[in-house]
């Protein structure tokens, strides 16, 4: 393990490994990442992997647009599948106010360069045959939206970062952080110390503990997120046999839910 680096990234989830990769991509090859266990072992391994292009913020929308393009480029760069599926995303509207919100967003999307379609209830059912259209006013669709597999993405990012000169230390827990008078840092781990110029905390569920190391009380706690996994639906299996495309991600904005196929194969379960 190095005892000196330009940057130390704490946390081996998708955020930490993406940070490491992008620093190395920008030319900061003297960067390392410390992960207390294994990559994705925190919350990344069971993340939904959705890539919602919908965002009312121009700046955040640009990041979302970049991400969709980047995932495809990363596969080519590393030769590692990230599980990217461009299956579209449909957001339902149960009232006119919601549709007005979608139309307002369409202006932001046009400025960013994100394609959107507006669907009538009949068009919704054509795209998502299992969806009941009772009480629906319409929907907005992102045809270039979809999802990725978070674990596969993280491993591809790690492969790309290593190829650019970055180093990843698994089973290496950060136990203390100390800032020196010259503003550099001593990062103490259970494997030794690393002196660096910059520390980036991407410690996810452990961010409060990381904050305490530098005297910060960060009011963040992990919470449970419920989801239901069903057996494969007969109509979805029939669609696959007929060679029809995956129905994509369906969101109920007024009910705060989403659904999608977990795996689009003959023995798949639906989420």
Locate predicted features.
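Glycine-rich FAD pyrophosphate-binding loop
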Residues: 25-43
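Dinucleotide-binding Rossmann-like beta1-alpha1 core, especially the glycine-rich loop
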Residues: 49-127, 254-259
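Helix-loop-beta segment of a Rossmann-like dinucleotide-binding subdomain
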Residues: 82-91, 125-164
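Conserved small/polar residues in nucleotide/adenosyl-binding loops
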Residues: 264-271
